[in-house]
Swiss-Prot record:
This is Forkhead box protein K2. Residues 1-13 have a biased composition (Low complexity). Component of SIN3A-, but not SIN3B-, containing multiprotein complexes. Interacts with DVL1, DVL2 (when phosphorylated) and DVL3; the interaction induces DVL2 nuclear translocation. Interacts with SUDS3. Interacts with BAP1 (when phosphorylated); leading to recruit the PR-DUB complex and repress FOXK2 target genes. Accessory component of the polycomb repressive deubiquitinase (PR-DUB) complex, at least composed of BAP1, one of ASXL1, ASXL2 or (probably) ASXL3 and one of MBD5 or MBD6. The PR-DUB core associates with a number of accessory proteins, including FOXK1, FOXK2, KDM1B, HCFC1 and OGT. Residues 249-344 bind DNA. The modification Omega-N-methylarginine is found at residue 135. Residues 291-309, 319-323, 339-344 are annotated as: DNA-binding. The modification Phosphoserine is found at residues 24, 230, 364, 389, 415, 419, 590. There is a cross-link at residues 152, 155, 518, 624 (Glycyl lysine isopeptide (Lys-Gly) (interchain with G-Cter in SUMO2)).
Length: 651
């Protein structure tokens, strides 16, 4: 590269054949400035050449060793003014205050772009505006030309000048790549010179492989270059110029470019060459880009079913077939022809459902957690779309019901291939409320009607209050001393007496349990009402009194007494027979059938003893029937206290 200092005296002969071409303005005034990526050149001569140094000679501004740049590529000159000669004490110098006395002549075979307008080799000299940009084709090498007027020469050293080597003011569209990252970037030269966010993400199928950026340091000159380009481009766009200034890659697919070209044709058809011409005319990016985009155009025309090939008639001159758009899809394609595509690298999905979403941040494959439905409530979109979350049931006012914690296992459906949530179970703890409390069940215990007694028989109703899930134990106290076991209907009805009143006693866990018994007198039951009973068994008066434990809560169905292995006096084992089922009169069994049904269908559940003694084996009850047969009845009973038992034996 040429040095940043101004060159004077040495250089190419003046263009246009004027005399005094080598002279310099008095005082070394700079009349123009050439600014590149890594250099700044102050023009103090009438003519300046730009190219690359070679054995055939040197140039004023060397642009390196790129093969796309000729040895003598550009020449910037000013015409001689006022017929001054070389011997004149004050040579003719450009009139920078005029602002339009600088011309450019293209000498290179590849031509040059001046503010996006191509200038070919051998074209007439182009009068330059006050500020313009040169770009060499097939490269991203740019030079900014700035004409310096007499009023601006004094401001040349001001800090606010954009050409001063100050710290770069990073623009939102500028990509600053450190030198240490240079080896990671593609070495291919970029066919476009505009560094923009849209161009940094290739939008065509071949964009990623056909273009790249040559890494260099971002200098203030690049920033001023983009700032200087913005005003002329906007002015020309406002004036309705045909040639767009933006030479960045257009955000359209190849199919969209083809549709644009065909629809803008007068007869709605174009040849392949006509499509190429339309694209290069409207999008300067494809003028200097790699020719691979033309192959993509041909492939789209051949493979896309929306494009129809129409042979050329023999009367029409030229060669090549025409291409048209399928009339059935023309309206839809034209509507989408100018719809800009989203640049690559921009996320096109949203994550509205938090961290468990399968697209946002997938959880670790080894992660399995327990979520509480009351605390977190986190769910995946898949679970929300397929089945609802189990909602907890609120307890009724005034009711204290125990709740059971149920752990359920749920597997989330797979939303994307390879999702780690598809194979790992997630446990959800759900609080479920048990069914409402069962109302108190009424048991009717009747004195035997076959026992001769002078006192009228008394029927007492016992209300048993239950609490879920514990099994209630109700003791009946205050009944007659006689113990009668009546086999009626489908079960065994038992009447017993408790010698000791129930008292609240501490249990193993420190809690107290209190048994509530409500006794209500009811009308006596006559022998006629129990006439349908199949068999009545009466025990003797001397039988020791036992305490009966009633186990509640079982569904109705086939009722049988539980079969147990019981011992009598700890000596031998007697099998437990099953109660005989028989038909019973509905009218007579209304009080007895209820107790028999619940007692026979109850499950055998362990209960705690109120007196805290060691559990003893249940005693076997042998009674004699009227016909002399013996029936063995096993009862889960609690033995009376020792003092009461001794007293009963003495009696």
């Amino acid at each position: 590269m040429a040095a940043a200092a101004a060159l004077s005296g040495a250089g190419a002969p003046p263009a246009g054949g004027g005399a005094g071409g080598g002279g310099s303005p008095p005082g070394g005034w700079a009349v123009a400035r050439l600014e590149g990526r890594e250099f700044e050149y102050l023009m103090k001569k009438r003519s300046v050449t730009i190219g690359r140094n070679s054995s055939q000679g040197s140039v004023d501004v060397s642009m390196g060793h790129s093969s796309f740049i000729s040895r003598r590529h550009l020449e910037i000159f000013t015409p001689p003014g006022g017929g001054h000669s070389a011997a004149a004490p004050e040579p003719a110098q450009p009139r920078p205050d005029a602002g339009g006395d600088f011309y450019l002549r293209c000498l290179g075979k590849n031509g040059v772009f001046v503010d996006g307008v191509f200038q070919r080799r051998g074209a007439p000299p182009l009068q330059l505006p006050r500020v313009c940009t040169f770009r060499f084709p097939s490269t991203n090498i740019k030079i900014t030309f700035t004409a310096l007027s007499s009023e601006k020469r004094e401001k040349q050293e001001a800090p606010e000048s954009p050409v001063k080597p100050v710290q770069p003011h990073i623009s939102p569209l500028t990509i600053n790549i450190p030198d240490t990252m240079a080896h990671l970037i593609s070495p291919l030269p970029s066919p476009t010179g505009t560094i923009s966010a849209a161009n940094s993400c290739p939008s065509s199928p071949r964009g990623a492989g056909s273009s790249g950026y040559k890494v260099g340091r971002v200098m203030p000159s690049d920033l001023s270059l983009m700032a200087d380009n913005s005003q002329p481009e906007n002015e020309k766009e406002a004036s309705g110029g045909d040639s767009p200034k933006d030479d960045s890659k257009p955000p359209y697919s190849y199919a969209q470019l083809i549709v644009q070209a065909i629809t803008m044709a007068p007869d709605k058809q174009l040849t392949l060459n006509g499509i190429y011409t339309h694209i290069t005319k409207n999008y300067p990016y494809y003028r200097t880009a790699d020719k691979g985009w033309q192959n993509s155009i041909r492939h789209n025309l051949s493979l896309n079913r929306y494009f129809i090939k129409v042979p050329r008639s023999q009367e029409e001159p030229g060669k090549g077939s025409f291409w048209r758009i399928d009339p059935a899809s023309e309206s839809k394609l034209v509507e989408q022809a100018f719809r800009k595509r989203r640049p690559r690298g921009v996320p096109c999905f949203r994550t509205p459902l938090g961290p468990l979403s399968s697209r946002s941040a997938p959880a670790s494959p080894n992660h399995a957690g327990v979520l509480s439905a009351h605390s977190s409530g986190a769910q995946t979109p898949e679970s929300l779309s397929r089945e609802g979350s189990p909602a907890p049931l609120e307890p009724e006012p005034g009711a204290s019901q125990p709740k059971l914690a149920v752990i359920q296992e749920a597997r989330f459906a797979q939303s994307a291939p390879g999702s780690p949530l598809s194979s790992q179970p997630v446990l959800i703890t759900v609080q479920r409320q048990l069914p409402p409390a069962i109302k108190p069940v009424t048991y009717t215990v009747a004195t035997p009607v076959t026992t001769p007694t002078s006192q009228p028989p008394v029927v007492q109703t016992v209300h048993v209050v239950h609490q879920i899930p514990a099994v209630s134990v109700t003791s009946v106290a205050g009944l007659a001393p006689a113990n009668t076991y009546t086999v009626a209907g489908q079960a065994v009805v038992t009447q017993a007496a408790v010698l000791a009143p129930p008292n609240p006693e501490p249990q193993e866990n420190g809690d107290h349990r209190e048994v509530r018994v409500k006794v209500e007198p009811v009308p006596a039951i006559s022998p006629a009402t129990l006439g349908a009973a199949s068999r009545i068994i009466q025990t003797s008066q001397g039988t020791p009194v036992q305490t009966v434990t009633i186990v509640q809560q079982a569904p109705l169905g086939q009722h049988q007494l539980p079969i147990k292995t019981v011992t009598q006096n700890g000596a031998h084992v007697v099998p437990m027979p099953t109660a005989v089922h028989s038909q019973v009169n509905n009218a007579a069994a209304s009080p007895l059938h209820m107790l028999a049904t619940h007692a026979s269908a109850s499950a055998s559940l362990p209960t705690k003893r109120q007196n805290g003694d060691q559990a003893e084996q249940p005693e076997l009850k042998r009674v004699k029937a009227e016909d002399g047969e013996s029936i063995v009845i096993a009862l889960s009973v609690d033995a009376p206290p020792a003092a009461v038992r001794e007293k009963a034996i003495q009696n």
